[in-house]
Curated annotation (Swiss-Prot):
SUPFAM superfamilies assigned to the protein according to its UniProt record, in alphabetical order: S-adenosyl-L-methionine-dependent methyltransferases
One function term, GO molecular function aspect: rRNA (uridine-2'-O-)-methyltransferase activity
Class of this enzyme: transferase
HAMAP family on file: RNA_methyltr_E (MF_01547)
Protein name (record): Ribosomal RNA large subunit methyltransferase E
Gene source species: Psychrobacter arcticus (strain DSM 17307 / VKM B-2377 / 273-4)
Ranges in coiled-coil conformation: none
Catalytic activity: uridine(2552) in 23S rRNA + S-adenosyl-L-methionine = 2'-O-methyluridine(2552) in 23S rRNA + S-adenosyl-L-homocysteine + H(+)
Length: 210
């Protein structure tokens, strides 16, 4: 009996989420426009406001699966640009996108990414990474901050002066401390909450110029 009650509660919660997801304007638009996820519109809006990703650039997309940011960035850099995507999860192939499956913290994966960069320089690092949330900020926030720190470390190791990091953060404990630390290495940090971010979401995107 207890199990059935628990399942009913989960079913109600799942049904509510599914209804919101189906009714979501950006979900419907993504399906119409051929993007793999509604997150595509977040990067599109960010780039409309910053114009950081341009034709011919080299961009690395961290935590790229399922690939909507890679779709957008690939379109923005064009045929003469390079888009390298990496994730520990598999990702279906995309035209003109080099996907490297693995943990970019591991030397062999990092070296593989940089080998694809070749003699070019990395112009922009993207990170839409987020942990599997538990619904408990005491657990979720430290996990998110760790991913942010990994993205910052990668950006510092690969970006030249003037290069940019576009990174998702969850507003909460640790964000101000991280921002202060980043100010020592980045000349400018800007915050943007795109229209495609759900209003109740704590997510924010930082645009940091090295």
């Amino acid at each position: 009996m207890a199990t059935r009650i628990e399942n009913k509660k989960l079913s109600k919660s799942s049904s509510a989420w599914m209804k919101e997801h189906i009714d979501d304007h950006y979900v419907q638009k993504a399906q119409k426009d051929g993007y793999r996820a509604r997150a595509a519109y977040k990067l599109l809006e960010i780039n409309e406001k910053t114009n950081l990703i341009k034709k011919g650039m080299t961009v690395v997309d961290l935590g790229s699966a399922p690939g909507s940011w890679s779709q957008v960035a690939g379109q923005l850099v064009g045929e003469k640009g390079i888009l390298i995507a990496s994730d520990i999860l598999p990702m279906d192939t995309l035209p003109d996108v080099t996907f490297i499956q693995g943990d970019f913290r591991e030397p062999e994966v990092f070296d593989h990414i940089m080998a694809e960069v070749g003699d070019r320089q990395v112009d922009v690092v993207l990170s839409d990474m987020a942990p599997n949330t538990a619904g408990n900020s005491a657990i979720d926030q430290p996990r998110m901050m760790y991913l942010c720190e990994l993205a910052v470390d990668f950006a510092l190791a690969t970006l030249p002066e003037g290069g940019a990091l576009i990174m998702k953060v969850f507003q909460g404990e640790g964000t101000q401390e991280l921002r202060k630390q980043m100010q020592a290495d980045f000349s400018k940090i800007r915050s943007i909450k795109p229209g495609a971010s759900r209003p109740r979401s704590k997510e924010m995107f930082w645009i940091a110029i090295k």
